Amino acid sequence: MIKSFKCKAAEKLYHRKFVRKFAGFERAALKRLEILDAAPTLGALAAFPGNRCEALSGDRKGQYSIRINKQWRLCFEWNEGAAEVEIVDYH
């Protein structure tokens, strides 16, 4: 379950509103948001290799990411649900 969003654009997309900067991959991003929202545990996300759920390090330590495509990631913190969810190009 998604508890909070760090990125207003990600929240807008989650509510099925058009976000220009996500044009071209909005369907894939929305699918990942739905998967994240439905996940009962972090382990459930990691159970599907296609999600490529991984713990981050460095200045993003404590966060996890799911790949949307080669460039964009769905980043979040996990504490009994997803929090501070954002869609970022952190490369």
Segments (PLM) and residue ranges:
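Short low-complexity stretches enriched in small and charged residues
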Residues: 32-33, 42
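Glycine-rich, flexible loop/turn motifs
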Residues: 1, 9, 18, 41-44, ...
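Conserved phosphate-interacting/catalytic interface
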Residues: 36
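Arg/Lys-rich, positively charged N-terminal/basic patches that mediate binding to nucleic acids
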Residues: 1-32
